[in-house]
Amino acid sequence: MSEPGAPRPRFDNLSDWLDWQERFHIRPIDLGLERVGRVADLMGLRPASAPVITVGGTNGKGSTVAFLEAIYRAAGYRVGVYTSPHLLRYNERIRLQGEPVGDGPLCEAFAAIDRARDNISLSYFEFGTLAALWLFRRESMDVILLEVGLGGRLDAVNILDAHVAVVTSVGIDHQSWLGEDREAIGFEKAGIFRGEQPAVCGDMDPPRRLLEHAASLDTPLALAGSDFHAGPVAENGVWDYHGMGMTLTALPPPGLAGSVQRGNAATAITAALLLEDQVPLTERAVREGIAQARLAGRYQCLQQDPAVWVDVAHNPQGARILGGHLADEPVKGRTLAVMAVMADKDVPGILEPLRSLVDAWYLGALDVPRALAPEELAVHLEGAAPVQIQASVAEACEAALLQASPGDRIIVFGSFHTVAAVLQAPFPWADAPLKSA
């Protein structure tokens, strides 16, 4: 509802707001903090309305945020979460108390931004970031979790000073924006660090420039492998966390599937411990949160026999992680891959760790301008396992299902759009709710 005397909002439904935002700014991606920071100040959104943990990294961002969200909710805190991109609905990007924000509050937030921006142009992502911060302030969140959209140093979420900054991993992706190697990319991701404010790096091989940037700011940096780590898994699935001068023994298996998730959980625990002076936690909340975390599209099982898994892996590092999951969990039958990918990705680098693990490939088209045509993707698979091309990702998945036998598994991957296409198609799992934490 508009404030008394306020001008009528530009639009009264979410779809119109989002369509307009996609066309409004001169560039779809426009990294930089000046414009969005000025509007944030005009709206009174700085400093932050609650303690902030900002999470960046090439892979593992969403999972680490999901663990943190579940831990803080288990402790009884009011948690505001901002992530991107979304899978099915824009509303997924902003969560209040574990639930996607409704259309009405989003429209109110966009109207407030539009009134305040004083002719300053904003990108689609900048509108979303400001909407999240406005809603977190209005709803009086106890803790705010922000996922970096792209890079870190010039990403819109970096208009707020993080009380704890997290870089989960550093791999090669988005080179045209962030640089061609891990050193350049690591520096961009370290841009969320603040002087004398704690930070966490979950990468076991942190780039030198990331370490140097932390040192130049006097940022206390907790490093995976030396300052904290996840212990091995016992036969009953439990594991130990070691770090920050303490040990948490017999932690439950993480609520997210895949061996990599213990490392993401350990990174989240470390970040939460570093914020304990402002947001105290109990060991019980940590245990419950680790077990209860959920996140759609991250090595998520949709059905059994044949097993259907979806994973948003879309860069070489993500593909290596996915390949590790598949190798760790061999099946009696075949592994069938349903894939579509964006044209600007390192396709050979994505395929390399998976070639030997896949017995048949099913490629489909995506109705996305950036998508690589399946015929072009097939060229990269010449000499590999058999390849089928279908008119859409959903039809590619249907073909894989029809040709799968008991004991086979199907893995759908390559981008958020690929996973979304399968989640919203009329398969048996289509009505299953999307879960975050």
Task: Specify the residue positions occupied by each region the protein language model found.
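Charged, amphipathic alpha-helical linker segments immediately N-terminal to NTP-binding catalytic cores
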Residues: M1-R27
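ATP-dependent carboxylate-amine ligase catalytic core
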Residues: N13-D16, R27-I29, L33-A48, A74-L160, ...
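Nucleotide phosphate-binding/pyrophosphate-handling subdomain across enzymes
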Residues: P51, R138, V143-L146, D155-V166, ...
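A conserved segment at the C-terminal end of the G1
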Residues: V55, S63-G80
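Beta-strand->loop->alpha-helix junctions that form or flank phosphate-binding loops
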Residues: Y82, C201-D203, A215-A234, G255-G258, ...
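Acidic, Mg2+-coordinating active-site environments of NTP-dependent enzymes
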Residues: I120, D142-E147, A162-A250, A265-R287
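C-terminal helical cap/extension that packs against the catalytic core
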Residues: V200, M204-R209, H213-A222, V233, ...
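Short, flexible loop segments at boundaries between secondary-structure elements
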Residues: L366-R370, D431-A437
